[in-house]
Amino acid sequence: MSVWTNWDPLEEVIVGDCYAPGDLDWCISLELRPVFNNMLLETKQDLDNLAALLKDLGAIVHRPRLYHYQQPINLSSFSVDIPMAPIVPRDQYLVYGNTIYQTFTSMIDRFFDGRSYYDIFKTLFENGSNWISQPMPNLWPMTDSKKWMDNYSNLGRMVYHRLYAKHLLWHTATMFKCGEHLITNTQGPGSQSGLAWMQRNLPANTIVSADSDALQNWGHIDHGFFMTDDDTVFCVDRSFVPEVLQNKTIHEIKSYFPPEKKQRIVQNFEHLLDESKGYEQVVSFNTNVLVVDPHNVIFSDHHAVLFDHLMSLGVRCHVAPLRHRAFWAAGIHCVTLDIKRRGNKRKIVNEV
């Protein structure tokens, strides 16, 4: 059971899951319930559809367990007001080599997220995988964030480099699996202490800095570019490609995409969006894809001209819509976690 890249043939994968309509009625006003419950219904349908597609493509699919809460959970120093469903496994979990890395972030609504994945990871552990976790942090509410963020141009860096600088917190979605190396946005989101924890639990020199012009070592790295084999990169434009991959064969595909439309978030749902997430970034959902193998890639939208172009290069494109991806801040790659791929550890990045 191992994973060394983002593109070796996928054998086992986790697909996130969502609450059903009515599960969160206890914290949603009567006025907003019809709209929000429809959003839950469609999100669950989309995730189930993605899981079915992956099964059709030959992967074994695992789903997290849903735990239902009926009230906020008070933990003395902070309260988990709305424990969200395990929709996005990519942010706090990484399977690299034969080890499961479990982290914590400033996202209070995902504080108990690990419970949902416990059975899956325990089975991997029983079958020989290693499983390690960051210590549980002591967080605090930031509902009055405007009082302390007014003087900072970047809330995310403020959260992790100042407010939580001494906490072990890390977003695993900052890391791109590339054989012997994890190409990483080393500034976060996540604290430098959290990065140090990752470094100490990995072989020496595994982590290499992304240094891409577009991301400047900040943000989730699983968009803007993807690879289909050891030597081929597809990207919005070269500015998203990490410096250590600039010598690969690079295909810029921005011209094939229509402008991304901002999805309108239902008014008065702001209380469901945690200001303390510490993750500010413009995300290219068009390239937040799951590479099933070097010849099959899953997108969340259909792009006929792009798909024809990729087919001419030997890559078949599949579509699994995510109708509310903007609300959940999650594309296809975000809502999945590859836990087994057929391939060996190898040197892919030549200049480190």
Could you describe each region identified by the protein language model?
Residues 1-352:
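The feature marks the mature, well-folded catalytic cores of soluble enzymes
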